[in-house]
């Protein structure tokens, strides 16, 4: 467990002339070098998409947010806490846009304790509202990785075997105050097939390195706010499923939203199953909702697993929006601009091609700029040229 892979220590490595990477242009500016670094980062994201790999598309993710006194540091503006909560709002929106049949929950750890900010839910508005309110939260004390992971594990270990169980920790402190041996907990997490990833805001911490390595997660330390946002974006796409995860057909129900009229004499207010379990401040008795087609249990939101009969309840658009993960769009062919003989305008945005390289779809042979290339692969998930070409071929 405690043995780290052999690698050369920083002071044992060869002398690196890192400043030679930076090159001035004719005007003495470093802008060209910086743009080249950003360009390579954008292209790397496109190629990092997993191809024909079995993915854990039904995800259950707990985000653990450090609420210790270190979150008041102002190296991120206006401070670490506010910056983190704003980026998490964006992350939640992207997460549900890319993973509509998944759920997320938020845990805050401070003063050696852990408490749930939100329960596992598929409703992004609920999480974003809680994150907005958490801006006024007081940061004090030390975080507890042990208590946070234990709280997340108590819920995740009961999730079905065909779903992915994940924890993402936003860790600002350099210490953790734990009531027991965290290395024993790491073994338990590994046995329960819970994948833990960490994003550090200060520096690398050994226990986080071991935690991520043993559970199959990732561990990165941010450089600045832009890098922070990119690291969060890496956790939007579903991870590859482990070889030991269950693979079977899943029964699903597709309930329609029913709204009863106040003038309907047979309409009877009823509680949602979610309100019965949680201490929610929202009104519990409502006339409408989603009713399980198998046992008629009522729910206010989808997706959800029925607490009575265990049936997974989703809507058809949820499945349709998850389809692109199974068949990701192939990366476009990269060609130097001076070697490209076609039109010098991007097919996507119709802007003039000014970058050093252009990107050509291998199917329809249309050309794109780097920004449209990234947008097509990250958001559209289909080539506009190929989509417009299909009706022409069929004679429509």
Swiss-Prot record:
The keyword Magnesium does not apply. The modification Phosphotyrosine is found at residue 95. Keywords: DNA damage, DNA repair, Metal-binding, Nucleus, Phosphoprotein, Transcription, Transcription regulation, Zinc, Zinc-finger. One of its GO terms (biological process) is nucleotide-excision repair. Pfam families: C1_4, Ssl1. It is found in: Nucleus. One of its GO terms (molecular function) is zinc ion binding. A zinc finger (C4-type) spans 292-309. SUPFAM superfamilies: Cysteine-rich domain, vWA-like. GO terms for cellular component: core TFIIH complex portion of holo TFIIH complex; nucleus; transcription factor TFIID complex; transcription factor TFIIH core complex; transcription factor TFIIH holo complex. Residues 60-236 form the VWFA domain. InterPro entries: C1-like_sf, Ssl1-like, TFIIH_C1-like_dom, TFIIH_SSL1/p44, VWF_A, vWFA_dom_sf, Znf_C2H2_type, Znf_RING/FYVE/PHD. Belongs to the GTF2H2 family. Component of the TFIID-containing RNA polymerase II pre-initiation complex that is composed of TBP and at least GTF2A1, GTF2A2, GTF2E1, GTF2E2, GTF2F1, GTF2H2, GTF2H3, GTF2H4, GTF2H5, GTF2B, TCEA1, ERCC2 and ERCC3. Component of the 7-subunit TFIIH core complex composed of XPB/ERCC3, XPD/ERCC2, GTF2H1, GTF2H2, GTF2H3, GTF2H4 and GTF2H5, which is active in NER. The core complex associates with the 3-subunit CDK-activating kinase (CAK) module composed of CCNH/cyclin H, CDK7 and MNAT1 to form the 10-subunit holoenzyme (holo-TFIIH) active in transcription. Component of the general transcription and DNA repair factor IIH (TFIIH) core complex, which is involved in general and transcription-coupled nucleotide excision repair (NER) of damaged DNA and, when complexed to CAK, in RNA transcription by RNA polymerase II. In NER, TFIIH acts by opening DNA around the lesion to allow the excision of the damaged oligonucleotide and its replacement by a new DNA fragment. In transcription, TFIIH has an essential role in transcription initiation. This is General transcription factor IIH subunit 2.
């Amino acid at each position: 467990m405690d043995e780290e892979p052999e690698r050369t220590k920083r002071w044992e490595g060869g002398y690196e002339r890192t400043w030679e990477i930076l090159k001035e242009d004719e005007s003495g500016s470093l802008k060209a070098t910086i743009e080249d670094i950003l360009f390579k980062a954008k292209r790397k994201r496109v190629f990092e998409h997993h191809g024909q790999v079995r993915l854990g598309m039904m995800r259950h993710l707990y985000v653990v947010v450090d609420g210790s006194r270190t979150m008041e540091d102002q190296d991120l503006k206006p401070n670490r806490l506010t910056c983190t909560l704003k980026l998490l709002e964006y992350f939640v929106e992207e997460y549900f846009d890319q993973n509509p049949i998944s759920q997320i929950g938020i845990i805050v750890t401070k003063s050696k304790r852990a408490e749930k900010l939100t329960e596992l839910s598929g409703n992004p508005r609920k999480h974003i509202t809680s994150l907005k309110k958490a801006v006024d939260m007081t940061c004090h004390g030390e975080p507890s990785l042990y208590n946070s992971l234990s709280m997340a594990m108590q819920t995740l270990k009961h999730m079905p075997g065909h779903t992915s169980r994940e924890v993402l920790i936003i860790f600002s402190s350099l210490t953790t105050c734990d009531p027991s041996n965290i290395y024993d907990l790491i073994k338990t997490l590994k046995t329960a097939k819970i994948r833990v990833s960490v994003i550090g805001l200060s520096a690398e911490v050994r226990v986080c390195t071991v935690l991520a390595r043993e559970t199959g997660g990732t561990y990165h330390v941010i450089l600045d706010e832009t890098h922070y946002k990119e690291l969060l974006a890496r956790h939007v796409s579903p991870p590859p499923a482990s070889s030991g995860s269950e693979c079977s057909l899943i029964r699903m129900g597709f309930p329609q939203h029913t709204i009863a009229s106040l003038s309907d004499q047979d309409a009877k207010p009823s509680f949602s199953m979610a309100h019965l379990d949680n201490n929610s401040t929202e009104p519990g008795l409502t006339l409408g909702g989603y009713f399980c087609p198998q046992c008629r249990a009522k729910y206010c939101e989808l997706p959800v697993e029925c607490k009575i009969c265990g049936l997974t309840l989703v809507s058809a658009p949820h499945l349709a929006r998850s389809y692109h993960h199974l068949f990701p769009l192939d990366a476009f062919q990269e060609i130097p601009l001076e070697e490209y003989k076609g039109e010098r305008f991007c097919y996507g945005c119709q802007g003039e091609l000014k970058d050093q390289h252009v990107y050509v779809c291998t199917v329809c042979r249309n050309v794109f700029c780097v920004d449209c290339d990234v947008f097509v692969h990250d958001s559209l998930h289909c080539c506009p040229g190929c989509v417009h070409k299909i009706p022409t071929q069929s004679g429509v």
